[in-house]
Each structure stands twice: as structure tokens, then as C-alpha cells.
A protein has these predicted regions:
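Short acidic capping loops at alpha-helix termini that bridge into adjacent secondary structure
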Residues: 92-98, 118-121, 168, 229-232
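A short helix-loop-beta submotif of the ANL/AMP-binding
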Residues: 137-144
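Active-site phosphate-binding strand-loop segment of PLP-dependent enzymes
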Residues: 144, 149-218
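Active-site PLP attachment segment
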Residues: 226-249
Length: 249
């Protein structure tokens, strides 16, 4: 049997925290070492459980949830999401603007597949949640990384972002609160990124999955509240704030 070779599309796709890093951790465990895995945001192994009302509602609704739902997700869930963001001062969002997926990661991949043509560029923070880089490259685009300055509390370097915008740039990814640094961005910083999107007609992709996990009186500012005049795509979910990483719809 001839060797089965993986697609060339995967040459620029790397997901170290679930690949090489995880394999090395398994190797060390096999040698008898105790490894504390912090490679992914999975709260369950550390004893954090989903709220009782979520568990109860899942059990109660299982008998009536055995078929396909609408392609965008359950109407009632999308309505609840609209109401949630209205409570945060984000208006003008319709139920038809809401898409529910099997976690934010699936929706990130779908967004990159739907947007990027060959050699289109996506500005992504460094360091980043590696799925963003992998998804952009897998879609045929090119992940271009901008610097998050360690000496400036991990905030994005606006001048570095400016220098990397090209005619091929389609959007800017903002991860706030940031994964992996934990930095929570100021309203002023978010406004600066929005202004770049405005000037260059770019889409803002705002990954806010950790928006409720805040420390030291930090306050999260949702990007969509500040960006009425540009297309802002917000990614969020139940996995982190509600400890429901294993719950899929």
C-alpha cells in the first residue's frame, strides 16, 4: 500500500498545544512525572463544574433535542444572546445576526473559510490562541502577527499593527481578555484598533471567550459596544465562564 500523504494545506497549520506539547506531556506522564496541563482552557479536570441550572436544563431538554435544530442554532438561545448583549449596551443586533456553533473554535474556522481568498491576510496577535493562526492558514490565507508588548501590560502595539496593514489585509483579530497573556484591554486601546479598521475598511474579529474571568478589578469592554459603524464579529461561549467545555450543541 502506498503511503498516504497529508494535504499540502496543512504545511502551515500548527496547533502545538494539542499536538507536540501535548505529546511531550504524555511522554513525561508515561515516565512517572506528574504533569499539570494548562495547555487548554479545560476547567473540569481541576474540579470546576458547570452550574447546576445548566446541567438540569440539559437533562430536562434531552428528550426534545434529538433532531437537528435550525442551522444558525436554537431560536430561544439566539434570542437570549441578543438580550445578553443588549444588557451590555450593544443594540442593533438582530436574532438573525447570531450564529451558534459547537464552540467558538468551530465558528472561528467557519469565519476564516468564508472570508479568506488565497493570500488574503489576517492580522493576529502574537502570542495568540493558536487556532486563529491555524484557521487563517488552513483557509488559504496568511496569518500576519502583530506584537503584544510585554512591557506595556501585554497590550497590542498599535504602531506595529499599522505597519503590517497591506492591500491584502481583510481583518484584525483582537483577543480580549487575551489568551494566553491574560491582559484585559482598555477602552482607549480598543478604540485605536477600531479606528484602524475604520480607516482601512477591515473587519474586527473580537474573541471575548474569557470576558467574565477577570481579576484585580479589571473591567472588560466589549468591542461591539464601541464599533457601530464597522463590521465587528464577536466570539463567545459557555466553555470558560460557565465551565461547560464538554457541553456541545
Amino acid at each position: 500500500m502506498r503511503p498516504i500523504i497529508k494535504s499540502n494545506k496543512l504545511d502551515t497549520v500548527c496547533y502545538d498545544i494539542r499536538g507536540p506539547v501535548h505529546k511531550e506531556a504524555r511522554r513525561l506522564e508515561d515516565e512517572g512525572h506528574r504533569i499539570l496541563k494548562l495547555n487548554i482552557g479545560n476547567p473540569a479536570p481541576f474540579g470546576f463544574e458547570a452550574p447546576e441550572e445548566i446541567v438540569r436544563d440539559v437533562i430536562l431538554n434531552l428528550p426534545s433535542a434529538q433532531g437537528y435544530c435550525e442551522s444558525k442554532g436554537l431560536f430561544s438561545a439566539r434570542k437570549a444572546i441578543v438580550q445578553h448583549y443588549q444588557s451590555q449596551g450593544i443594540f442593533g443586533v438582530d436574532i438573525e445576526d447570531i450564529y451558534i456553533g459547537n464552540g467558538a473554535s468551530e465558528l472561528i474556522v467557519m469565519a476564516m473559510q468564508g472570508l479568506l481568498n488565497p493570500d488574503d491576510e489576517m492580522l493576529i496577535p502574537s502570542p495568540d490562541y493558536p487556532l486563529w493562526t491555524a484557521a487563517a492558514n488552513l483557509a488559504g490565507g496568511k496569518a500576519v502577527h502583530y506584537r503584544c508588548d510585554e512591557e506595556a501590560d501585554g497590550f497590542p502595539d498599535i504602531e506595529d499593527i499599522k505597519s503590517k496593514i497591506s492591500p491584502r489585509t481583510r481583518g484584525i483579530v483582537l483577543i480580549n481578555p487575551n489568551n494566553p497573556t491574560g491582559a484585559v484591554y482598555s477602552e482607549e486601546l480598543i478604540q485605536q484598533v477600531i479606528e484602524l479598521c475604520r480607516q482601512h475598511d477591515l473587519i474586527l474579529f473580537s474573541d471575548e471567550i474569557y470576558d467574565k474571568i477577570l481579576y484585580d478589578e479589571a473591567q472588560h469592554v466589549p468591542a461591539a459596544r464601541l464599533s457601530d459603524d464597522i463590521l465587528t464579529v464577536t466570539f463567545n461561549g459557555l466553555s470558560k465562564a460557565y465551565r461547560a467545555a464538554g457541553f456541545r450543541v
